[in-house]
Amino acid sequence: QPTVAEAAASLRSELLDLRARAYADADLASADPQMAAATVVERTALRAAALDLNLRAATALVAASGGGAMMLSSNAQRRAREALFLLVQGQTADLRQASLGYLTD
């Protein structure tokens, strides 16, 4: 079983990888306008991956916090609600489909 520190390190590593990939795609799209259209699918996949990571990180925080995470004053509870809000706020049909792919894999 991972410790809280190990879980946090794993999630952070995944975050840094997603961030690097997102910046690389943005740089590619800004350098070549034709590539901007070509990277739409990749950017949608990255957004879905980021939403999935956010949800898993919030869930890990709730799990690490224990029963107190359900209190309205809890930071973990607030993060969990925010993660769920971001999962549905402003999603396109393509992003919703990609997000469902992450949730069902």
Residues covered by each model-derived region:
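Catalytic-core signal marking the mid-to-C-terminal active-site face
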Residues: D27-A49, A58-A60, A64, A76
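Short amphipathic alpha-helical coiled-coil/interface segments
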Residues: A8-L15, R43-A58, A80
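Extended aliphatic helical segments
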Residues: V4, V40-V41, V62, A69, ...
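Charged/polar positions within long, soluble alpha-helices
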Residues: L16, A20-Y23, D27, L55-A63, ...
